[in-house]
Amino acid sequence: MDRRISGSTQLLGLIGDPVAHSLSPAMHNAALAAMGEDYCYVPFPVAAERLAVAVAGLAAIGVRGFNVTIPHKQAILPLLSQVEARAAAVGAVNTVYALPEGGWGGTNTDIDGFVQPLLGLEKGIPTLILGSGGAARAAIQGCLELGLGPVRVAGRSPEKLRALQQTWPQVETLSWAELDRHLAETRLLVNTTPVGMHKPGSLAELSPLSWEQLRLLPAGATVYDLVYVPDPTPLLRMAAELGHTPIGGLEMLIHQGAKALSLWLGGKLVPVEVMRQAARQQLAQIGDPNS
């Protein structure tokens, strides 16, 4: 399809620092082309100290909506006119949309992306989340919305664990040393830590849990790693070898993007498979995306 940009082309985008290796432009522009929409999705590198002026600038030039990635997901909250309740609970926004009356609204489609591969799971299954950072917050909210539980979170930062329990009192928090005693009943294991991520000089061949720990999971457990480079991660390779069901983090990225794009386009059906193919092609080319 001819993708000429004209005076009528509408702008969407991504702000973060860095954004050069993001898969989002490839995914969104492929979907927009397939849908015949006169939109263009552009990555905008925005340093932390320039966030407020950048957000004002996007409004001034008529951008219809944009995604938000590291390091702005929390910092953008006070710059928005309204924030949806689930995003406020998580304390982070990753999708921003123009309001009819002016200003910006914010939501968190990371939650939607997280839950999409889990929709077939039965409710009430014991769930263990590894990590206590921003990704863990989206995972907790998603698990609770799906009716999974009990939901437990294991982390290394007592301060972050306390903050999680203040937001979600029904969630049990564990020190890293305590997690082994819960593995035998864990039907869904979620890694939200960066361990296993392929980056220069890195933790690429590491896993947040050992082979011996993964063997403690019940037969047929689901293991979900939000890391997607490499694919599969060491954690997912071991999980598959042990007969568990592996889910890679690329699905979360694709589905959060699809949800955001549908929101910007007024609820239109988005070609998820087109986005998946574009993401995989881009991933094969760059190898080490940042978002």
From Swiss-Prot:
Residues that hold shikimate according to the record: 22-24, 69, 94, 110, 228
GO cellular component terms, A-Z: cytosol
Matches recorded under InterPro entries: Aminoacid_DH-like_N_sf, NAD(P)-bd_dom_sf, SDH_C, Shikimate_DH-bd_N, Shikimate_DH_fam
Reactions the enzyme catalyzes: shikimate + NADP(+) = 3-dehydroshikimate + NADPH + H(+)
Pfam families tied to this protein: SDH_C, Shikimate_dh_N
GO terms under biological process: amino acid biosynthetic process; aromatic amino acid family biosynthetic process; chorismate biosynthetic process; shikimate metabolic process
Protein name: Shikimate dehydrogenase (NADP(+))
Keywords, ordered alphabetically: Amino-acid biosynthesis, Aromatic amino acid biosynthesis, NADP, Oxidoreductase
GO molecular function: NADP binding; shikimate 3-dehydrogenase (NADP+) activity
Pathway field: Metabolic intermediate biosynthesis; chorismate biosynthesis; chorismate from D-erythrose 4-phosphate and phosphoenolpyruvate: step 4/7
Complexes and interactors: Homodimer.
